[in-house]
Regions:
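A short, conserved, highly charged catalytic patch centered on acidic carboxylates
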Residues: 1-109, 121-161
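A short beta-strand->alpha-helix segment at the C-terminal rim
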Residues: 111-115
């Protein structure tokens, strides 16, 4: 899987549009990592409507959350957004909205990721304080480090509080 993702990152066709970035790079990484975490499901492009009055409605690219006993999505603790047109600022606005929505559902800690597929940025919202990691990671230069960070986030959100 690692070699396929590496090939996809180096293939210009993977960056034709937002859909190909999601399908050829982001999804395979998330699905590969999630296989190690029974409770953490990858929810792709599902509605996440928490508070319409506060504007906390939408369809984030990916939410990582357990299933409810009825098969629906429980409160997510990790949000991954594809940075449309390489716009990280807009991507973080969308990610932070999903993270705040989770905090309204009593999440004390929520992680966020914004990526172009090649460049990955990481942040967290803890007790209403947002922290953006000042170092972005290049999957082109260090795919293993990208996997390690995503895996670390899955591990953190999979542990009981």
């Amino acid at each position: 899987m690692f070699s396929i993702i590496t090939e996809n990152i180096n293939d210009g066709l993977s960056f034709v549009n937002e859909v190909t970035i999601c399908e050829r790079i982001i999804s395979p990484i998330l699905i590969f990592v999630s296989r190690n975490y029974e409770r953490s499901n990858v929810w792709s492009h599902v509605s996440y409507n928490v508070d319409e009055k506060k504007g906390l409605v939408g369809e984030p690219d990916y939410l990582i959350a357990p299933r409810t006993k009825y098969g629906g999505m429980a409160r997510p603790s990790l949000c991954i957004i594809e940075a449309k047109r390489d716009d990280f600022e807009e991507g973080w606005a969308q990610a932070l909205a999903a993270m705040v929505a989770s905090s309204l559902l009593d999440a004390k800690l929520c992680y966020g990721v914004v990526t172009t597929g090649k460049t990955w940025e990481f942040g967290k919202l803890e007790d209403s304080v947002f922290t953006l990691d000042p170092i972005s990671i290049s999957a082109t230069d260090n795919l293993q480090k990208t996997f390690n960070i995503i895996n670390w986030m899955f591990d953190k959100i999979s542990k009981p509080v």
